[in-house]
Design a protein with these regions (language model features):
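N-terminal subdomain of lithium-sensitive/metallo-dependent phosphomonoesterases centered on the IMPase/IPPase/PAP
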Residues: 1-81, 136, 170-173, 234-236
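Oxyanion/phosphate-interacting regions
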Residues: 1-5, 11-12, 169-178, 192-262
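Acidic beta-strand-loop-alpha-helix segment within the catalytic core
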Residues: 98-193, 238, 242-262
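Residue-level signal for inorganic ion chemistry
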Residues: 10, 14, 37, 48, ...
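Glycine-rich active-site/cofactor-binding loop and its immediate structural neighborhood
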Residues: 72-111
C-alpha cells in the first residue's frame, strides 16, 4: 500500500505540470525531458528511500554506474514518467512505473495512470490488484485480478502508434494461424500492459528500442497472471541489471495465448 501511495503522489505532481505549459528539454540521446519527469523522480526516490534505505534504486532519471550496481541482488527500478512524448502531446497515455527486482527478475510491479486514476500492482507472491483512486487518502475501488481464461475473438494485439515494422507483420501472420482476424489496440507507454492484464488484449510485440525501466513492472504483473514477456528471438525471459540497460526486442503474451501458440 505504501508503494501505491508513492505512485499516486508522483502522479498528482505530474498532473500539476500536465495542466500547465510544458517546458521540454532533451537528454543526450535526444529523448524529451520535462520538469514533470524530474519532479516525479524526486518524489519516488525520496519516498522509496524512506520506505527502506537498504534497497538501492535505479531510475531513468537517476542513473547509476555499472560498477556500482553490477552486484545488486535486490533493487527498485523506476520510470517516473513513462511516455513523456504522450505527456507532451497531452493524450493521457503516460504512466508511473515502479518495479522491485530480485536476482535479476522482476518480482513486483506497479503501473499507475495519473490521468485515468488507475493502477495495476502486485507480483507472484501477492497476486495482482486493480486499484481505482481519487487521491492518496481515497483509493475508491480494489479488485483482485485473475488470470485471463481465454483469448479474444478476434485476437487483439496492443501496440504503439508507430508504423508496423517487418517483424511485427510476421508476428501478425503467426497470430492469424490462430485467429483469421487480428485487431489492434494502439496505446502509448506501459499502459499496453493494462490491456494485457485485463484481458482486453492478447499480445504485445515490441520490435523497437525500450529500456529496462519501461518493461519490468509490466513483466512482473503479466507473469503473475500466467503470461510471459520473452526475448523475441530466443524465447527466454528478459534479463535485468545488464551493463547496457537496453532491452532486446520482445513479445508479451497472456496465459491462454501461450497455451495456443506453444
Amino acid at each position: 500500500l505504501r508503494v501505491c501511495n508513492i505512485a499516486i503522489k508522483a502522479g498528482e505532481e505530474i498532473l500539476k505540470y500536465y495542466n500547465d505549459d510544458i517546458d521540454v528539454t532533451h537528454k543526450d540521446d535526444s529523448s524529451p525531458l520535462t520538469k514533470a519527469d524530474l519532479a516525479s523522480n524526486k518524489i519516488i526516490i525520496d519516498n522509496l528511500k524512506n520506505l527502506d534505505s537498504s534497497i538501492p534504486i535505479l531510475s531513468e532519471e537517476s542513473l547509476i554506474t555499472w560498477n556500482e550496481r553490477k552486484n545488486w541482488n535486490k533493487y527498485w527500478l523506476v520510470d517516473p514518467l513513462d511516455g513523456t512524448k504522450e505527456f507532451i502531446n497531452r493524450n493521457g497515455e503516460f504512466a508511473v512505473n515502479i518495479a522491485l527486482l530480485r536476482d535479476g527478475k522482476p518480482v513486483f510491479g506497479l503501473i499507475a495512470s495519473p490521468e485515468q486514476k488507475l493502477m495495476y500492482v502486485g507480483g507472484t507472491e501477492t497476486g495482482i490488484f486493480k486499484i481505482e483512486f481519487d487521491s492518496i487518502e481515497n483509493p475508491t475501488k480494489w479488485e483482485t485480478i485473475s488470470d485471463p481464461t481465454e483469448i479474444n475473438d478476434p485476437i487483439v494485439m496492443t501496440c504503439s502508434r508507430s508504423h508496423h515494422s517487418g517483424p511485427v507483420i510476421h508476428f501478425i501472420n503467426d497470430l492469424k494461424k490462430i485467429s483469421p482476424t487480428v485487431e489492434f489496440a494502439k496505446k502509448g507507454s506501459s499502459l499496453k500492459f493494462f490491456d494485457l492484464a485485463s484481458g482486453a488484449a492478447d499480445a504485445y510485440p515490441r520490435f523497437a528500442p525500450t529500456m529496462e525501466w519501461d518493461i519490468a513492472a509490466g513483466q512482473a504483473i503479466l507473469e503473475a497472471l500466467g503470461g510471459s514477456v520473452v526475448h523475441a528471438e530466443t524465447g527466454l525471459p528478459l534479463c535485468y541489471n545488464k551493463e547496457n540497460l537496453t532491452n532486446p526486442y520482445f513479445i508479451a503474451k497472456i496465459k491462454p495465448l501461450l497455451a495456443l501458440s506453444s
